[in-house]
Amino acid sequence: TAYNTAMGYNAGVGITTGTDNTLIGGLAGDALTTGSLNVAIGRSALGADDVGNRNVAIGYACLQSQNFSTSTDSYNTAMGYGAGSSVTTGIENTLIGSLAGDALTDADFNIAIGWGALGADTKGNKSVAIGTGALDAQNFTTSTDAFNTAVGHGAGGAVTTGKFNTFLGAVSGAVFTTGEKNVAVGTYALDRDTQGSRSVAVGYQALTNQN
């Protein structure tokens, strides 16, 4: 039994043997053929994938580029206008907020929550960005385990290729670009250094003048 639900112009129009899909909106999941257990709500949500499984795309163009060549349990979740809109073969990403992770392509295991969070990266893996503009400049052009964590408005917002950083607090580590292995906890902590490494700053404006 199929248990598919489709509402909207050409929603799920290509499904052949896929099951348990919920597709709501014009062209939502319109390329799915054998993909199963997907939820796509919004125009063109999950609109290119034909064999992917277990995805949630809620919002205009969410996961619209995802497309696996073989049946794959990808476990991607994207919610918000354009969230994850460039993901092609990345797996296990959670992208919530308008344009969150919207440049990611084949990156894996990322969490981006907030407008534009992790919005420039294409191939970085295993980063957590929570807050408007958090890690929104990070961009690895080859598959890289970045292990950056940024929580707070603009936290780590200038990081490009730095790795192993933890920024907790609004604007913490805000101008870091390539610095690595730093910890900044507190609003404005370590917010002027650009390339330093192995520093720990805890408290409001801690190490704010280090550069």
What are these regions (language model features)?
Residues T1-N211:
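Glycine- and small/polar-enriched repetitive beta-structure motifs of secreted/surface proteins
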